[in-house]
Regions:
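Aromatic-rich, lipid-facing transmembrane alpha helices and their immediate juxtamembrane interface loops
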Residues: 1-182
Length: 182
């Protein structure tokens, strides 16, 4: 595993715990600040950083829409709100940054079925862990809730990684791109 992949993993974990534990302990601003710092460092290491920023912004919007829908339909609950709060939105670009070139999950844009499987398993696991740590509440039927989240993430994760391949790295898989890379 490369140093960039290890740093990608560390950024993912640090951002996730800052968002979830910050929200659970009454510091909902903490996670977005940590994620913003981590993403700033991430973007600084990417070729085509303007495209990366654009893509991370798209991912944040997608995350806001998805989580707001889950909240509005009662799949998830966060007391006092029916729209996705900033700490929950921040988790989306934090996760998707690991699919960038050199990142922990950089092979996902070339493997949409693996991306779907990761979404189907990892999404529910993350939401369940967030609920166990007190940041969110799951709907009244835990297994149904996790199944819904799994289906949503099984669709959204491969869609986002395929979008990454189109928006950020349209030539990432050609030999000319690899030769031009430092």
């Amino acid at each position: 595993m490369s140093v960039r992949a290890v740093l990608s993993f560390m950024g993912l974990q640090l951002g996730w715990f800052a968002c979830v534990l910050g929200a659970a302990r009454g510091y909902p601003w903490l996670g977005p600040v940590v994620v913003l710092v981590a993403l700033s460092m991430h973007v600084g290491k990417q070729r085509g950083s303007a495209r990366e920023i654009f893509f991370l912004g798209i991912t944040a919007v997608v995350g806001f829409v998805v989580d707001t829908a889950l909240l509005r339909f009662g799949v998830l609950r966060i007391p006092g709100t029916t729209i996705s709060p900033p700490w929950l939105v921040a988790l989306w670009p934090n996760f998707i940054s690991t699919t960038a070139e050199g990142g922990l999950l950089s092979s996902l844009p070339r493997r949409p079925l693996l991306a779907s499987l990761l979404g189907a398993v990892g999404g529910p696991a993350a939401y369940d862990a967030g609920a166990r740590l007190g940041a969110i509440e799951l709907g009244s039927h835990r297994l149904v809730t996790l199944a819904i989240v799994g289906v949503v993430w099984a669709v959204v994760v491969p869609a986002l990684v395929l979008l990454r391949a189109r928006v950020v790295t349209p030539f990432a898989h050609t030999s000319a791109y690899r030769q031009a890379a430092p």
